[in-house]
Amino acid sequence: TILSHFMSFMGIKTQWLDVRNFIKTNSNYRDAEVDWELTQATISKNVKKKMLNITQGFLGSDENNFTTTLGREGSDYTAGIFAYCLNAESVTIWKDVPGVMNADPRYFENASLLSHISYREAIEMAFYGATVIHPKTLQPLQKKEIPLYVKSFINPMLPGTCVSKGSDSEWQIPSFIVKRDQLLISLSSIDFSFIMEENISEIFALFHQFKLKVNLIQNSAISFSVCVEDKFGNFKDLNPILSKKFKVDFDENVTLYTIRHFNDKAAQTVEQNKTVLLKQVSRETMQIVTKEK
């Protein structure tokens, strides 16, 4: 409301929209799901397309008009919701970085800007831990092929990154995603019996119960390894339960590196001067769990 009143004071005609009257959700207050049909109808009816509309992000309301929130990166998601409902030409979100980088400059001194990536690549990067764009923001835009521009509010004249429809073969520069303070857990069967689906299902149920977020999985006939985020320090309580059925080995304070479109040089960059505890490779992605020597 402050921005709206200021712009009106400056002679710029605006319409203030309390977003809670427009984005309708269920009652999961901290991570609400959007009622798209009702939201679309409300936004389409009330937003004046030839006027500057100002609203807030992150919020919605349920069927009883109680305030809800949209979860992590909810403000960016709000922009995506309005763009979808209004069939916008594009969306721009403003960050404290030049755009989407191929690596975090804090950890990689030669990090470079990705000027153009596909929706698919952006969602893959977000899944593995990149924090600039949340997948929820991209999903409604991808459905209607609305381009997303990620730009810097510190240097607004920089070109930033465009996320849009395109072939993933266009961007093959390796991208590095880093997750620090991880916990690597290795479970082995005590009697050399196979670790089967029912064992894995039980393990995952325990991880969910103790709020451990799984970021990597690797299994063999008689062992099962996971790299997890123990944000609440619950592994100390989970370990005795797991130890009743499995031999438990674990390494604390490890780092998980994910390399999209990896090559030998990229892998060497990550592994240099580190102890590699686990490595997993697929067609486009390499994940490496390391510990400092």
At which residue positions do the language-model features occur?
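Nucleotide/pyrophosphate-binding catalytic subdomain
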Residues: 1-133, 138, 291
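Short phosphate-binding/catalytic loops that engage adenosine nucleotides
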Residues: 12, 146, 212
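Flexible loop/turn segments at secondary-structure boundaries
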Residues: 24, 61-63, 100-101, 156-159, ...
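Electropositive, surface-exposed helix/loop patches at the edges of structured domains
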Residues: 47-62, 125-149, 186-200, 251-270
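Short hydrophobic alpha-helical runs that function as membrane-insertion/retention elements
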Residues: 90-94, 148-150, 215
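A conserved active-site cap/scaffold subdomain adjacent to cofactor or substrate pockets
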Residues: 116-164, 170-172, 180-182
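A conserved regulatory-domain signal marking ACT and ACT-like small-molecule sensing domains
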Residues: 159-293
